[in-house]
């Protein structure tokens, strides 16, 4: 029923092309298109604007950053039930780091929708990832947390984010460090800096 309503809304909208492009990325038609347009506006556009005309994606970027961390934490918590906090935190940091978000923005085609005065904004080290965060913030305002989770689960995990590969890289870090140190003839010392004791 929701899909039918969204499609009818799409048919009678004045910006079908933009909605269609967003649907290819999101997997659903957006409702509040204006918030997605704002998510794709880089602050460089404000150079020639004044007063209330100034608008950019930085507030949505702030919101999206928090939502992404929550969604990824949620997904990892359920995907790896036997893993400790340190492992989950390490894997999450790799997924949400700037280089990963830049890659997601490029692979999903989001970079083609970004509005910026920078000619080569696709190569800027911040713009694509920031826009991706803002996009997730827009999804949250438009549809809520569940749809942000769905976006990651159905559109990103597996296709653009290989959880098993990221987890394996984390599991193998210690062994790779030892292997590298032996090759370079360095001595690596592992020292216990803390221990959690649970009372029974």
Across the structure, where does each feature detected by a protein language model lie?
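Double-stranded RNA-binding/processing signature
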Residues: 1-200
């Amino acid at each position: 029923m929701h899909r039918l309503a969204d499609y009818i809304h799409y048919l009678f909208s004045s910006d079908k092309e933009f909605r269609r492009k967003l649907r290819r990325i999101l997997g659903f038609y957006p409702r509040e298109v204006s918030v997605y347009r704002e998510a794709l506006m880089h602050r460089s556009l404000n150079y020639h604007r004044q007063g209330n005309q100034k608008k950019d994606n930085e507030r949505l970027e702030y919101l999206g950053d928090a939502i992404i961390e929550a969604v990824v934490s949620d997904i990892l918590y359920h995907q790896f039930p036997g893993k400790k906090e340190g492992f989950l935190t390490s894997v999450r940091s790799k997924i949400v780091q700037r280089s990963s978000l830049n890659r997601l923005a490029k692979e999903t085609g989001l970079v083609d929708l970004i509005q910026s005065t920078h000619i080569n904004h696709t190569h800027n080290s911040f713009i694509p990832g920031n826009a991706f965060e803002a996009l997730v913030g827009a999804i949250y305002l438009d549809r809520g947390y569940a749809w942000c989770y769905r976006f990651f689960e159905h559109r990103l995990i597996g296709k653009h984010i290989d959880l098993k590969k990221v987890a394996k890289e984390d599991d193998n870090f210690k062994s790779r460090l030892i292997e590298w140190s032996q090759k370079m003839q360095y001595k690596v010392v592992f020292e216990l800096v803390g221990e959690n004791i649970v009372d029974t």
